[in-house]
Design a protein with these regions (language model features):
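Nucleotidyltransferase catalytic core that binds NTPs
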Residues: 1-148
Length: 148
């Protein structure tokens, strides 16, 4: 059985997310998705609209996904590959040549897939007028901060 692993925040789930998951699953038999926790997003300076548990449940409902695990920090990738017996790590092409994934090539294959043209969480936020940088950090309203 060929096992595939990918990482992401997967907030504001959209067609581009579904496509990378579909294409990743086509490369193997079992797809593990590591989704960034709320705490890890804070470390990265990112704010997700949906909390970790909601994003995890949405990913678990997608037919291409076999297992969802938390991504707690940058340094867990090597351990994830070994623990889940991963054959291939798949990421979007925007991560190509990034040391965080290149260092895994001694223990597994690393594949970079082209992003789906014209769709991204950032673009959705911009199109909706929800992306408002604060001190250089992307912010969007949440149900608790919206004025009705």
């Amino acid at each position: 059985m060929k096992r595939i692993l990918t990482y992401g925040t997967f907030d504001l789930l959209h067609f581009g997310h579904i496509e990378i998951l579909r294409r990743a699953k086509e490369l193997g038999d079992y797809l593990v998705v590591a989704v960034s926790t709320d705490e890890f997003n804070a470390i990265k300076g990112k704010k997700a609209y949906h909390n970790f548990n909601t994003r995890k449940k949405m990913l678990e409902a997608i037919r291409y996904v076999d297992l969802v695990i938390p991504e707690n920090d940058w340094n867990q990738k090597r351990n994830d590959v070994l623990e889940y017996k991963i054959d291939t790590v798949v990421m979007g092409s925007d991560w190509e040549n990034n040391e965080k994934f290149e260092v895994l090539k001694d223990i597994c294959e690393v594949v970079y897939l082209p992003r789906t043209e014209g769709v991204s969480t950032t673009k959705i936020k911009q199109d909706l007028g929800l992306q408002q940088p604060v001190n250089g950090v992307e912010q969007i309203p949440t149900p608790n901060t919206m004025n009705n």
